[in-house]
């Protein structure tokens, strides 16, 4: 489940590529963990839309956004843990 207000806890935007970082928590165990969604914005006539498919030239940017998301998550984690705990 995504966080209560359905907004990412952090976003990384590089050009049209966006990596959204979500904090999830188990209702049963209370365990917390981060997940990441990656999307690309594009314009279709007068509307902006998002897609999760990427063109060849998007891939280096996607790679960098994921690398930055990983670093941000790592900074949030307590020493000695691989995931966040509230």
Show which residues each predicted segment covers.
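Single-stranded nucleic acid-binding surfaces, predominantly the OB-fold ssDNA-binding core
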Residues: 1-86
């Amino acid at each position: 489940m995504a966080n209560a207000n359905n907004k990412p806890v952090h976003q990384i935007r590089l050009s049209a590529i966006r990596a959204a970082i979500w904090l999830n928590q188990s209702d049963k165990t209370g365990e917390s963990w981060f997940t990441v969604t990656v999307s690309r914005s594009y314009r279709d006539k007068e509307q902006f839309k998002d897609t999760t498919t990427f063109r060849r030239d998007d891939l280096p940017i996607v790679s960098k956004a994921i690398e930055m998301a990983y670093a941000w998550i790592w900074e949030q984690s307590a020493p000695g843990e691989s995931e966040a705990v509230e």
